[in-house]
Amino acid sequence: MSRRGTAEEKTAKSDPIYRNRLVNMLVNRILKNGKKSLAYQIIYRAVKKIQQKTETNPLSVLRQAIRGVTPDIAVKARRVGGSTHQVPIEIGSTQGKALAIRWLLGASRKRPGRNMDFRLSSELVDAAKGSGDAIRKKEETHRMAEANRAFAHFR
């Protein structure tokens, strides 16, 4: 057993313009090769495009999109005997948000289009409306969990 104390849990910082933790989480996930200023530019341009498309508060669209994509349950591979089962497990809110952001960014990267801010804004607007690739991914995960409900006791 370790003699060291437990590490303090870091709190998520908020971004400088919108003072929002979700925006900062999005920036940190979109970040590539340490280019944080570029990540901020992409996010802020995407937020402006959302404002132009929907003519509503872009942060509420972002919140709605993330809430719509956040999964309640997921499957985890668990080896029992000689076979591997997909065991459904519940997901906490922090992990769910992280998964939702990852799925939204993955779906927007796969989208055809000019640049990342255009694709990200389109994906966020679609997710807020209840369509798009990220929503499909969440529904697929829920279907997998429902199909493997019989293995829930392996937790």
Swiss-Prot record:
Instruction: Give TM segment ranges.
Output: none
Q: Which InterPro entries does UniProt cross-reference here?
A: Ribosomal_uS7 (IPR000235), Ribosomal_uS7_bac/org-type (IPR005717), Ribosomal_uS7_CS (IPR020606), Ribosomal_uS7_dom (IPR023798), Ribosomal_uS7_dom_sf (IPR036823)
GO cellular component terms attached to this protein's record: chloroplast; small ribosomal subunit
Mind telling me which SUPFAM superfamilies this protein's record contains? Ribosomal protein S7
Protein's UniProt keywords contain Cytoplasm: no
Record key words, sorted: Chloroplast, Plastid, Ribonucleoprotein, Ribosomal protein, RNA-binding, rRNA-binding
Query: Does Amino-acid biosynthesis count among this protein's keywords?
Result: no
Molecular function GO labels: rRNA binding; structural constituent of ribosome
What job does this protein perform? One of the primary rRNA binding proteins, it binds directly to 16S rRNA where it nucleates assembly of the head domain of the 30S subunit.
Subunit (UniProt): Part of the 30S ribosomal subunit.
Name used for this protein in its record: Small ribosomal subunit protein uS7cz/uS7cy
**Which species is this record about?**
Phalaenopsis aphrodite subsp. formosana (Moth orchid)
